[in-house]
Amino acid sequence: MRTIRVATIALGALVHVAGAQSIQYRSPSGVEYRSMADTGAVARARAALDADPRNVDRVIALGVAQSGVRQFREAIETFTRGIAIAPDNAMLYRWRGHRYLSVRELDRALADLSRGFALDSLNYGVLYHLGIVRFARGEFDAAADAFRRAQPRAPEVGELTGSTDWLWMSLSRAGRHAEAKAMLDRRPDSVKVANAYAQRLRLYRGEIGPDEVITAADTADVQKATLAFGVGNWYVVRGDTARARTYFEASIRSGGWPGFGFILSEVELRRLR
Protein backbone atom coordinates (compact mmCIF):
# COMPACT_ATOMS: atom_id res chain seq x y z
CA MET A 1 0.00 0.00 0.00
CA ARG A 2 2.82 2.38 0.91
CA THR A 3 4.47 1.66 -2.46
CA ILE A 4 1.28 2.53 -4.30
CA ARG A 5 0.90 5.74 -2.29
CA VAL A 6 4.47 6.82 -3.03
CA ALA A 7 3.97 6.05 -6.72
CA THR A 8 0.77 8.11 -6.74
CA ILE A 9 2.54 11.07 -5.15
CA ALA A 10 5.37 10.75 -7.66
CA LEU A 11 2.90 10.61 -10.53
CA GLY A 12 1.19 13.74 -9.23
CA ALA A 13 4.52 15.51 -9.13
CA LEU A 14 5.20 14.46 -12.71
CA VAL A 15 1.81 15.76 -13.80
CA HIS A 16 2.58 19.14 -12.22
CA VAL A 17 5.96 19.26 -13.95
CA ALA A 18 4.41 18.33 -17.28
CA GLY A 19 1.70 20.94 -16.77
CA ALA A 20 4.34 23.53 -16.00
CA GLN A 21 5.75 23.06 -19.51
CA SER A 22 2.40 22.71 -21.25
CA ILE A 23 1.32 24.31 -24.50
CA GLN A 24 -0.66 27.44 -23.69
CA TYR A 25 -1.22 28.90 -27.12
CA ARG A 26 -0.63 27.81 -30.69
CA SER A 27 -0.49 30.67 -33.19
CA PRO A 28 -2.28 30.51 -36.56
CA SER A 29 1.11 29.84 -38.14
CA GLY A 30 1.63 26.84 -35.85
CA VAL A 31 4.10 28.34 -33.37
CA GLU A 32 3.64 26.78 -29.93
CA TYR A 33 4.05 28.93 -26.83
CA ARG A 34 4.61 27.09 -23.57
CA SER A 35 4.46 27.85 -19.89
CA MET A 36 7.50 27.87 -17.64
CA ALA A 37 8.49 25.61 -14.78
CA ASP A 38 7.39 26.46 -11.26
CA THR A 39 10.17 27.87 -9.10
CA GLY A 40 8.23 27.31 -5.88
CA ALA A 41 5.47 29.91 -5.85
CA VAL A 42 2.87 27.61 -7.42
CA ALA A 43 3.69 24.74 -5.06
CA ARG A 44 3.40 27.00 -2.02
CA ALA A 45 0.10 28.48 -3.21
CA ARG A 46 -1.25 25.01 -3.98
CA ALA A 47 -0.31 23.76 -0.52
CA ALA A 48 -2.01 26.76 1.09
CA LEU A 49 -5.18 26.12 -0.91
CA ASP A 50 -5.12 22.40 -0.11
CA ALA A 51 -5.18 23.37 3.57
CA ASP A 52 -8.29 25.53 3.06
CA PRO A 53 -9.85 24.50 -0.27
CA ARG A 54 -12.87 26.85 -0.13
CA ASN A 55 -10.84 29.96 0.61
CA VAL A 56 -11.39 32.21 -2.43
CA ASP A 57 -8.40 34.41 -1.61
CA ARG A 58 -6.21 31.31 -1.75
CA VAL A 59 -7.82 30.24 -5.01
CA ILE A 60 -6.90 33.61 -6.50
CA ALA A 61 -3.39 33.39 -5.03
CA LEU A 62 -2.83 30.04 -6.75
CA GLY A 63 -4.16 31.34 -10.07
CA VAL A 64 -1.94 34.41 -9.85
CA ALA A 65 1.09 32.23 -9.04
CA GLN A 66 0.33 30.01 -12.03
CA SER A 67 -0.01 33.09 -14.21
CA GLY A 68 3.40 34.28 -13.03
CA VAL A 69 5.01 31.29 -14.75
CA ARG A 70 2.72 31.53 -17.77
CA GLN A 71 0.58 28.56 -16.74
CA PHE A 72 -2.47 30.39 -18.01
CA ARG A 73 -4.66 27.41 -18.86
CA GLU A 74 -3.97 25.93 -15.45
CA ALA A 75 -4.88 29.30 -13.92
CA ILE A 76 -8.16 29.30 -15.85
CA GLU A 77 -8.99 25.93 -14.27
CA THR A 78 -8.12 27.34 -10.85
CA PHE A 79 -10.33 30.41 -11.26
CA THR A 80 -13.13 28.21 -12.59
CA ARG A 81 -12.85 26.21 -9.38
CA GLY A 82 -13.19 29.47 -7.47
CA ILE A 83 -16.27 30.53 -9.44
CA ALA A 84 -17.94 27.25 -8.48
CA ILE A 85 -17.39 28.27 -4.84
CA ALA A 86 -18.22 31.97 -5.19
CA PRO A 87 -20.15 32.61 -8.43
CA ASP A 88 -20.70 36.30 -7.63
CA ASN A 89 -17.08 37.20 -6.89
CA ALA A 90 -16.07 39.89 -9.40
CA MET A 91 -12.35 39.31 -8.90
CA LEU A 92 -12.60 35.72 -10.09
CA TYR A 93 -14.14 36.90 -13.35
CA ARG A 94 -11.55 39.67 -13.61
CA TRP A 95 -8.72 37.14 -13.34
CA ARG A 96 -10.23 34.41 -15.48
CA GLY A 97 -11.15 36.94 -18.15
CA HIS A 98 -7.57 38.22 -18.16
CA ARG A 99 -6.24 34.71 -18.57
CA TYR A 100 -8.68 33.90 -21.38
CA LEU A 101 -7.24 36.96 -23.08
CA SER A 102 -3.74 35.55 -22.58
CA VAL A 103 -4.67 32.38 -24.49
CA ARG A 104 -6.55 34.37 -27.17
CA GLU A 105 -10.06 33.22 -26.27
CA LEU A 106 -11.51 36.68 -26.71
CA ASP A 107 -15.20 35.78 -26.60
CA ARG A 108 -14.77 34.04 -23.25
CA ALA A 109 -12.64 36.91 -22.00
CA LEU A 110 -15.38 39.37 -22.94
CA ALA A 111 -18.06 37.27 -21.26
CA ASP A 112 -16.10 37.02 -18.01
CA LEU A 113 -15.09 40.67 -17.89
CA SER A 114 -18.62 41.79 -18.72
CA ARG A 115 -19.85 39.62 -15.85
CA GLY A 116 -17.18 41.13 -13.61
CA PHE A 117 -18.33 44.62 -14.62
CA ALA A 118 -21.94 43.75 -13.80
CA LEU A 119 -20.81 42.65 -10.34
CA ASP A 120 -18.42 45.54 -9.68
CA SER A 121 -18.44 48.42 -12.15
CA LEU A 122 -15.75 50.31 -10.19
CA ASN A 123 -13.07 47.62 -10.21
CA TYR A 124 -9.95 48.87 -11.99
CA GLY A 125 -8.77 45.43 -13.11
CA VAL A 126 -12.15 44.60 -14.60
CA LEU A 127 -12.37 47.94 -16.43
CA TYR A 128 -8.80 47.87 -17.71
CA HIS A 129 -8.94 44.36 -19.12
CA LEU A 130 -12.42 44.92 -20.51
CA GLY A 131 -10.91 47.84 -22.41
CA ILE A 132 -8.16 45.62 -23.80
CA VAL A 133 -10.67 43.06 -25.06
CA ARG A 134 -12.85 45.77 -26.62
CA PHE A 135 -9.78 47.21 -28.36
CA ALA A 136 -8.84 43.76 -29.67
CA ARG A 137 -12.35 43.40 -31.10
CA GLY A 138 -12.07 46.75 -32.87
CA GLU A 139 -14.70 48.31 -30.59
CA PHE A 140 -12.66 51.45 -30.00
CA ASP A 141 -15.41 53.67 -28.59
CA ALA A 142 -16.33 50.99 -26.06
CA ALA A 143 -12.64 50.51 -25.25
CA ALA A 144 -12.27 54.25 -24.65
CA ASP A 145 -15.25 54.19 -22.30
CA ALA A 146 -13.69 51.37 -20.27
CA PHE A 147 -10.30 53.07 -20.01
CA ARG A 148 -11.89 56.42 -19.15
CA ARG A 149 -13.67 54.71 -16.26
CA ALA A 150 -10.49 52.89 -15.24
CA GLN A 151 -8.15 55.89 -15.33
CA PRO A 152 -9.25 57.63 -12.09
CA ARG A 153 -9.38 54.28 -10.27
CA ALA A 154 -5.79 53.24 -11.01
CA PRO A 155 -4.28 51.79 -7.81
CA GLU A 156 -0.81 53.21 -8.46
CA VAL A 157 1.07 55.43 -10.91
CA GLY A 158 2.22 52.60 -13.16
CA GLU A 159 -1.36 51.50 -13.75
CA LEU A 160 -2.41 55.12 -14.29
CA THR A 161 0.20 55.41 -17.02
CA GLY A 162 -1.12 52.24 -18.63
CA SER A 163 -4.76 53.32 -18.64
CA THR A 164 -3.77 56.76 -19.95
CA ASP A 165 -1.86 55.14 -22.82
CA TRP A 166 -4.70 52.82 -23.76
CA LEU A 167 -7.24 55.64 -23.50
CA TRP A 168 -5.21 57.72 -25.95
CA MET A 169 -4.93 54.77 -28.34
CA SER A 170 -8.64 53.96 -28.10
CA LEU A 171 -9.77 57.55 -28.66
CA SER A 172 -7.34 57.92 -31.56
CA ARG A 173 -8.44 54.70 -33.25
CA ALA A 174 -12.06 55.80 -32.81
CA GLY A 175 -11.20 58.96 -34.75
CA ARG A 176 -11.64 61.15 -31.66
CA HIS A 177 -8.29 62.87 -32.07
CA ALA A 178 -9.19 66.15 -30.37
CA GLU A 179 -10.35 64.27 -27.27
CA ALA A 180 -7.19 62.17 -27.28
CA LYS A 181 -4.98 65.27 -27.43
CA ALA A 182 -6.98 67.12 -24.78
CA MET A 183 -6.71 64.13 -22.46
CA LEU A 184 -2.92 64.01 -22.85
CA ASP A 185 -2.68 67.78 -22.40
CA ARG A 186 -4.28 67.42 -18.96
CA ARG A 187 -1.29 65.21 -18.05
CA PRO A 188 -3.13 62.72 -15.82
CA ASP A 189 0.14 60.76 -15.72
CA SER A 190 2.13 63.68 -14.29
CA VAL A 191 3.84 61.50 -11.66
CA LYS A 192 6.88 60.06 -13.39
CA VAL A 193 7.28 56.32 -13.67
CA ALA A 194 9.68 54.16 -15.68
CA ASN A 195 7.71 51.66 -17.73
CA ALA A 196 6.86 50.89 -21.35
CA TYR A 197 3.67 52.94 -21.28
CA ALA A 198 5.55 56.02 -20.08
CA GLN A 199 7.93 55.62 -23.02
CA ARG A 200 5.02 55.33 -25.45
CA LEU A 201 3.29 58.39 -24.00
CA ARG A 202 6.41 60.44 -24.70
CA LEU A 203 6.03 59.43 -28.36
CA TYR A 204 2.36 60.45 -28.44
CA ARG A 205 3.26 63.85 -27.00
CA GLY A 206 6.01 64.42 -29.55
CA GLU A 207 8.77 64.39 -26.93
CA ILE A 208 10.65 61.61 -28.73
CA GLY A 209 10.54 60.11 -32.21
CA PRO A 210 9.43 56.57 -33.10
CA ASP A 211 13.03 55.39 -33.45
CA GLU A 212 13.74 56.45 -29.87
CA VAL A 213 10.99 54.50 -28.14
CA ILE A 214 12.82 51.16 -27.98
CA THR A 215 16.25 51.49 -26.37
CA ALA A 216 19.18 49.17 -25.74
CA ALA A 217 17.96 48.80 -22.15
CA ASP A 218 14.70 47.23 -23.34
CA THR A 219 15.65 43.56 -23.39
CA ALA A 220 12.70 41.78 -21.74
CA ASP A 221 10.44 40.05 -24.24
CA VAL A 222 7.14 41.54 -23.04
CA GLN A 223 8.72 45.00 -22.77
CA LYS A 224 9.87 44.84 -26.39
CA ALA A 225 6.50 43.53 -27.54
CA THR A 226 4.70 46.32 -25.68
CA LEU A 227 6.90 49.09 -27.05
CA ALA A 228 6.86 47.81 -30.63
CA PHE A 229 3.07 47.54 -30.63
CA GLY A 230 2.75 51.10 -29.33
CA VAL A 231 4.87 52.46 -32.15
CA GLY A 232 2.98 50.37 -34.69
CA ASN A 233 -0.36 51.64 -33.43
CA TRP A 234 0.98 55.22 -33.54
CA TYR A 235 1.76 54.70 -37.23
CA VAL A 236 -1.75 53.29 -37.83
CA VAL A 237 -3.22 56.44 -36.28
CA ARG A 238 -1.07 58.48 -38.67
CA GLY A 239 -2.21 56.40 -41.65
CA ASP A 240 1.16 54.74 -42.32
CA THR A 241 0.24 51.06 -42.36
CA ALA A 242 3.50 49.99 -44.02
CA ARG A 243 5.61 51.20 -41.10
CA ALA A 244 2.96 49.97 -38.68
CA ARG A 245 3.30 46.46 -40.08
CA THR A 246 7.08 46.56 -39.52
CA TYR A 247 6.60 47.30 -35.83
CA PHE A 248 3.80 44.77 -35.35
CA GLU A 249 6.06 42.13 -36.86
CA ALA A 250 8.86 43.21 -34.52
CA SER A 251 6.48 42.78 -31.59
CA ILE A 252 5.82 39.19 -32.65
CA ARG A 253 9.54 38.50 -33.05
CA SER A 254 10.14 39.63 -29.46
CA GLY A 255 8.75 36.35 -28.15
CA GLY A 256 6.78 38.18 -25.43
CA TRP A 257 3.62 36.29 -26.28
CA PRO A 258 1.69 36.92 -23.03
CA GLY A 259 1.96 40.70 -23.44
CA PHE A 260 -0.98 42.73 -24.66
CA GLY A 261 1.30 44.33 -27.23
CA PHE A 262 2.04 40.92 -28.74
CA ILE A 263 -1.62 39.89 -28.66
CA LEU A 264 -2.76 43.12 -30.29
CA SER A 265 0.04 42.96 -32.86
CA GLU A 266 -1.34 39.60 -33.98
CA VAL A 267 -4.78 41.20 -34.25
CA GLU A 268 -3.50 44.21 -36.19
CA LEU A 269 -1.54 42.06 -38.63
CA ARG A 270 -4.74 40.16 -39.40
CA ARG A 271 -6.53 43.48 -39.97
CA LEU A 272 -3.81 44.57 -42.38
CA ARG A 273 -4.08 41.51 -44.61
Predicted regions and their residues:
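Structural marker of alpha-solenoid helical repeat scaffolds
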Residues: 51, 85, 119, 153-156, ...
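Helix-start (N-cap) detector for alpha-helical repeat units in TPR-like alpha-solenoids
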Residues: 56-57, 90-91, 124-125, 158-161, ...
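Canonical positions in the second alpha-helix
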Residues: 47-48, 81-82, 115-116, 149-150, ...
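N-terminal leader/linker segments that initiate helical-solenoid repeat arrays
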Residues: 20-57, 61, 68-69, 273
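Register position in tetratricopeptide repeats
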Residues: 68-69, 102-103, 136-137, 173, ...
